[in-house]
From Swiss-Prot:
MF (Gene Ontology): DNA binding
Source organism of the structure: Variola virus
Taxon lineage: Viruses, Varidnaviria, Bamfordvirae, Nucleocytoviricota, Pokkesviricetes
Name this polypeptide is given: Early transcription factor 82 kDa subunit
Family: Belongs to the poxviridae VETF large subunit family.
GO process annotations (BP): positive regulation of DNA-templated transcription
Length: 710
């Protein structure tokens, strides 16, 4: 998809706020008659032919920088006031009413700020209209000011316009990953979103649900509730969860849909804050080792790592790679990831158009000093030589070997060999971490022959290494695990599941050397990421997936012992991962994965019962395993436009005490969630005599529910 840089509009107004000049700013040579800016000009201002100016307001400017730029653009030397009809710019009222210098009121406190344009004008990437008035023409001339233009901004803009025609802005935004936002979207807002989905008639499935303190679920579109937990879920046409909100947070997988739904309705949502990461794929490669040759602090801040940039407010981080850019922002700003990608591509065209080769000798302090270092007893740093010894055998075009020496020749024809005075580290190999990240072949000295390693095959024989090959390094538990990684289990489960199993690690690091079998954590197979945000989500997932799930120090089982599958899942940062057994031979980097020993956890399953009817009528049967209609389990989500009231039933002390032994063991579900179920509520509604509660429980859950009775 080709990114189109949106036009911008600058309006200079006179004493009566009449438009004196209308400047249509664009990097293109024409007016986009389909753009919202042109529609606004024609329909609202009745201006058919604005001044077309080949310039561009950088959205990264502060208000003072913007004011200096606009004074230069309009050639105004007087004090000016800048404002907009859509958002507050340099001035705002304390209640966030839109400021207009021609309609000033002293009844509200006026605040001045010098924030960044894209922060105060969230829609600026798509629609930017700025009004400029001479301060003396307004009712508050004392609020005006004059700012000198930053010549570096003008210089950068000139270079930007010069290179713009040659920019390849074909990009694809692949993912929005950290998509849980903090908000305060309450009942009114949730119901308005539901109504908006229904009004749009877009065939998206929507569900408004609630659950009380007894975790009895109710679903529907209309409720009368008092401070009880709500959840709104909307699914895409393909069944993928597009957004979900519990009122305090909102998970957004489809940002465009969410923006469209709330753009013109009052959801009474005061804030929406959170992190979101975009991965933008580029049609044309860039130089990731970016170097800025002029002052550009009004756009980016350079970091110590030459492929990482920060926005001027340090709230947006940009990681550059050859074929893609990762952009992490603190708050959702529509299309900001595309705009920053445009700036990065432009800067590459300005300053980094020639792709330079990464000569290993020029980055010696980065790689050798940190990774492949010499110590008292280890000499792992390769040395550079000028010639090959006679009689060396050619292994490949860049690798030679003799009985005494191995030599690697990099792309710059520099020869590396290992000459350990102690005679130990004399085998040339390569650092996996840099090869995995950048395909750099960084030589290092090893104790043993490295020719069996996949990285060696890639660097020496140019054999493509499978992209999803798993690194033998095992991460500490707690980080999200990608396809090429694995991590340890939490300490308590590592000790339990790996009792009697061993994993030999290389000295001084967490690189797996050899194991005949060891339980670890892997990402789940397949392309779909499963997020579980609430206890309700966890229970639903376990019962539908029918496998064991570890969450923190708890183990969740499906409701029925007969349903338990052979997989073990584990939740890390709300993302479902998989527990597997890893096996590896010392002589190879190849890693094999096998199913876990699920029986270790299954044997701890605390509730084993046979299916027992509780009450039946007209083909409907309530059992200890669920509610059945004509023999079929009823598990449909209900959607109703009727108001429903339920009376909560308090679980008696006798019931809680009866089930208390269960909770000395691994917990299948939360205590209240297990005791206060439909079964308990209905049993009590059946007018069971309080004196007979224990006998009734023994009928349906004998022996505290731990032993199955045949």
């Amino acid at each position: 998809m080709r990114y189109i840089v949106s036009p911008q509009l600058v309006l200079q107004v006179g004493k009566g706020q009449e438009v004196e000049r209308a400047l249509y700013l664009t990097p293109y040579d024409y007016i986009d008659e389909k753009s919202p800016i042109y529609y606004f000009l024609r329909s609202h201002l009745n201006i058919q032919q604005p001044e077309i100016v080949k310039r561009h307001i950088l959205l990264t400017l502060r208000m003072t920088q913007l004011k200096g730029y606009l004074g230069n653009l309009l050639d105004i030397k007087d004090d000016i006031i800048i404002y907009s009809h859509k958002n507050n710019l340099e001035y705002s009222y304390v209640d966030n009413t839109i400021f207009n210098p021609f309609v000033y009121t002293q009844k509200k406190t006026l605040l001045k700020n010098d924030s960044f344009l894209y922060n105060v004008y969230p829609g600026a990437c798509d629609f930017l209209v700025i009004w400029v008035a001479r301060a003396c023409d307004t009712s508050i001339p004392e609020f005006g000011s004059y700012e000198d233009v930053d010549n570096n901004i003008i210089k950068f803009e000139t270079m930007l316009m010069d290179v713009f025609p040659q920019l390849d802005l074909d990009i694809t935004v692949e993912s929005k990953f950290n998509n849980i936002f903090r908000t305060n979207l309450k009942l009114t807002g949730l119901k308005k979103i539901i109504q908006r989905v229904q009004d749009l008639d877009i065939n998206y499935k929507s569900l408004l649900s609630r659950y009380d303190e007894h975790f009895i679920n109710m679903t529907g579109n209309h409720f009368i509730l008092n401070d009880e937990q709500l959840n709104l879920s909307i699914w895409d046409l393909d069944g993928t969860l597009a957004l979900s909100s519990d009122g305090d947070t909102v998970m957004i997988n489809n940002v465009k849909l969410f923006t469209d739904l709330v753009s013109d309705i009052d959801t009474q949502m005061e804030r929406i804050k959170g992190d979101i990461t975009y991965k933008v794929h580029l049609a044309t490669p860039i130089n990731s080792r970016i170097k800025l040759d002029i002052e550009t602090s009004f756009i980016f801040i350079e970091t110590a790592t030459n492929n990482i940039l920060l926005s001027s407010d340090k709230k947006i981080s940009i990681i550059l790679a050859k074929n893609h850019i990762s952009i992490k922002v603190k708050n959702h700003i529509p299309n900001i990831e595309k705009y920053f990608t445009f700036l990065v591509i432009a800067i590459n065209a300005m300053f980094n158009s020639v792709q330079k080769s990464a000569d290993f000798t020029k980055v010696e302090t980065v790689y050798w000093s940190r990774i492949c270092q010499n110590t008292k007893n280890k000499n792992r740093k390769p040395v550079i030589i000028n010639y090959l010894d006679p009689g060396m055998k050619k292994i490949s075009n860049n690798f030679y070997r003799s009985d005494e020496k191995e030599v690697f020749i990099n792309d710059n024809d520099i020869m590396f060999t290992c000459m350990d005075p102690l005679g130990k580290y004399n085998k040339v190999g390569f650092l996996n971490i840099f090869h995995d990240m950048r395909k750099y072949c960084i030589p290092c000295c090893f104790l043993h022959d490295q020719s069996h390693r996949s990285t060696f095959s890639s660097c020496v024989h140019q054999i493509d290494v499978e992209k999803k090959i798993v690194s033998p390094y095992i991460l500490n538990f707690g980080k999200v695990v990608t396809e090429s990684k694995m991590s340890f289990l939490p300490i308590i489960f590592d000790a339990f599941l790996n009792d009697g199993m061993t994993a030999n690690m290389e000295q001084d690091n967490k690189r797996l050397k050899e194991t005949s079998g060891y339980h670890i954590v892997r990402c789940c197979t397949g392309n779909d990421i499963v997020r579980l945000r609430t206890t309700s989500n966890i229970i639903q997932f376990v019962n539908e997936d029918k496998n064991i799930l570890i969450v923190n120090d708890m183990v969740y089982f499906p409701m029925n012992a007969s349903d338990i599958g052979k997989k073990i899942h584990i939740l890390i940062q709300e993302i479902v991962h998989e527990v597997m057994i890893v096996k590896k031979k010392e002589s190879s980097d190849k890693i094999d994965f096998f199913p876990p020993n699920y029986k270790l956890l299954k044997d701890l399953f605390p509730k084993q019962t046979i299916q027992t009817p509780i009450q039946s009528d007209a083909g409907m049967v309530l059992t200890t395993d669920g509610f059945y209609i004509d023999g079929k389990l009823f598990n449909e989500d209900l959607s109703s436009k009727y108001v429903t009231f339920t009376k909560n039933v308090i679980t008696s002390d006798a019931v809680a005490k009866y089930f208390s032994p269960l909770f000395k063991y691994v917990i299948s579900e939360a205590k209240d969630r297990f005791i206060k179920t439909w079964m308990i509520n209905i049993m009590i509604h059946m007018n069971v005599d309080p004196n007979n509660i224990i006998p009734t429980l023994e009928k349906y859950y004998p022996n505290f529910g731990r032993v199955q009775i045949n």
